[in-house]
C-alpha cells in the first residue's frame, strides 16, 4: 500500500518508469521512451515521467531527438527512487533536452562511488540544459558522491522546493563540488544542506541568487562562489568554508533580505578563491552587513551574536571553524552601534577600546576582533549553576547536567 501511495501518478498523461535490478519496466504511452536497454532507460521526448524503484548501476538517460523543435521540459517525478553508480556514470544524465525538471516525493537517494567515466558529463545529476527541482517537491533528494559534482548543469540550476541534502565529502583523497552551474544558480524555496570537499554553491560564469529557503553549507573550499554577482533577498543562509563568499573582480554583492552568516578560515571577504584581493561592488546591499576579521580562530560551535542594548538582533552559529565573518540581517542598520559576543564573550576591535561596534555604512568592516578585557559574558547552560554542593570545607557549583562549573567568578545562581 505504501509503494502504491508513493507511486501515484501526479498527471494523467505520465509514463511510469519502474527501476529494478531485475529489469526496468515502463507503463503507459511509451512513445517518449525510445528504449530500455539493460539498466538504462532512454527518454527521447518531452513530457511527464514518474520514476520509482531501486537499481544499481542503472541510468535515466534524457536524449530528446530534437530539443530545438521539442523544447518543452522533460519532467521526472521521483517517487522513492534509490540509484547507485559504481562506474562513475551519472544516475540521471540530461544529454539533450530543452529543460529537465525534477519533482521529488518520498525519500530519493542517489549515490556514486567512482570517478566519472566522461569528465564532460561528470555529476550524479548532469544536464546540458536547465535543471530545476520544482516548487511542487514535497520530499527529499539525498545525493552522496565521493568524486563527482552532485548536481551539475552547463546552463542554469534552480532549486525551488523540497529538502535537498548533498554530501561530496566522503573521500579524503578527492575534491568534488556540491552544486555547479555554468550560468545562473538560484535557490527559491528549497531547503538545501551541503557538505562538500570542494565548493558548495558555484556559478562558473554568472550569478548565484538566493531568494528564499534555508541554505546550510560546510565546504572544503568556497562556500559560495559566483562569477558576476551574489544576490541574497531572503531566507536563512549559513555558509562556512575555508573561504566563505568569493566573487571575481568587479563582482557584485547585493544583500537585500534574509539572515546571512558567511564564515572562512583562509581569506576575508574581498578576496577571490585564489586569495587575490578583488574589487567588489556592495552598493546593492540595502540591509546592514557586518564584516568581522578576528585576531584568532574560533570553533564552529561558537555563535556570533550582535546586540543593541540588551536586545539580541542577530545570532547564528557557523558550520565550521572560522577567522573571518560576514553577517547580515534586516534587523541590522548601517547607522547603529552594537555589541558583539562570540561564544557568549564580549568582543572589541582595533577601532574601539570599549567594545562598541559602530556602523559607518551599510557594510562596515571591523579588524582585529578579539575578547574585550573585563567585558561581560553571556551566561550559557554550561556556566549557569543550578546546584551548590557542600563537602567539608569547600563548595562546588554544578550545572544542570551535573558537571562542575569551572568559572565561578561569572556564575549566575538560579
Question: Where do the model's predicted regions map?
Answer:
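A composition-driven surface/loop motif
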Residues: 1-414
Amino acid at each position: 500500500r505504501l509503494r502504491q501511495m508513493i507511486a501515484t501518478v501526479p498527471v494523467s498523461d505520465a509514463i511510469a518508469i519502474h527501476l529494478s535490478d531485475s529489469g526496468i519496466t515502463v507503463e503507459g504511452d511509451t512513445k517518449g521512451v525510445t528504449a530500455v536497454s539493460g539498466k538504462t532507460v532512454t527518454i527521447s521526448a518531452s513530457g511527464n515521467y514518474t520514476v520509482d524503484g531501486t537499481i544499481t548501476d542503472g541510468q535515466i538517460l534524457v536524449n530528446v531527438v530534437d530539443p530545438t523543435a521539442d523544447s518543452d521540459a522533460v519532467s521526472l517525478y521521483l517517487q522513492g527512487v534509490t540509484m547507485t553508480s559504481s562506474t562513475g556514470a551519472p544516475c540521471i544524465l540530461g544529454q539533450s533536452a530543452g529543460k529537465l525538471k525534477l519533482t521529488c516525493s518520498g525519500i530519493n537517494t542517489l549515490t556514486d562511488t567512482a570517478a566519472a567515466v566522461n569528465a564532460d558529463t561528470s555529476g550524479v545529476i548532469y544536464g546540458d540544459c536547465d535543471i530545476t527541482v520544482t516548487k511542487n517537491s514535497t520530499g527529499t533528494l539525498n545525493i552522496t558522491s565521493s568524486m563527482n559534482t552532485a548536481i551539475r548543469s552547463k546552463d542554469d540550476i534552480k532549486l525551488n522546493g523540497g529538502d535537498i541534502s548533498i554530501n561530496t565529502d566522503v573521500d579524503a583523497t578527492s575534491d568534488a563540488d556540491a552544486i555547479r552551474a555554468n550560468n545562473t544558480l538560484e535557490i527559491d524555496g528549497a531547503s538545501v544542506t551541503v557538505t562538500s570537499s570542494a565548493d558548495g554553491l558555484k556559478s562558473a560564469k554568472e550569478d548565484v541568487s538566493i531568494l528564499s529557503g534555508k541554505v546550510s553549507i560546510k565546504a572544503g573550499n568556497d562556500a559560495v562562489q559566483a562569477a558576476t554577482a551574489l544576490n541574497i533577498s531572503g531566507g536563512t543562509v549559513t555558509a562556512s568554508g575555508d573561504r566563505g563568499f568569493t566573487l571575481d573582480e568587479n563582482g557584485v554583492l547585493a544583500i537585500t533580505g534574509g539572515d546571512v552568516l558567511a564564515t572562512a578560515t583562509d581569506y576575508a571577504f574581498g578576496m577571490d578563491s585564489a586569495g587575490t584581493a578583488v574589487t567588489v561592488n556592495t552598493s546593492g546591499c540595502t540591509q546592514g552587513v557586518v564584516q568581522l576579521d578576528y585576531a584568532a580562530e574560533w570553533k564552529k560551535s561558537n555563535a556570533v551574536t550582535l546586540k543593541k542594548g540588551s536586545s539580541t538582533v542577530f545570532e547564528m552559529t557557523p558550520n565550521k571553524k572560522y577567522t573571518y565573518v560576514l553577517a547580515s540581517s534586516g534587523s541590522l542598520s548601517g547607522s547603529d552601534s552594537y555589541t558583539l559576543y562570540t561564544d557568549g564573550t564580549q568582543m572589541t576591535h582595533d577601532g574601539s577600546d570599549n567594545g562598541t561596534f559602530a556602523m559607518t555604512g551599510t557594510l562596515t568592516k571591523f579588524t582585529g576582533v578579539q575578547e574585550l578585557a573585563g567585558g561581560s559574558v553571556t551566561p550559557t547552560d554550561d556556566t549557569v549553576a543550578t546546584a551548590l554542593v557542600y563537602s567539608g570545607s569547600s563548595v562546588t557549583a554544578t550545572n544542570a547536567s551535573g558537571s562542575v562549573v569551572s568559572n565561578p567568578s561569572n556564575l549566575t545562581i538560579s
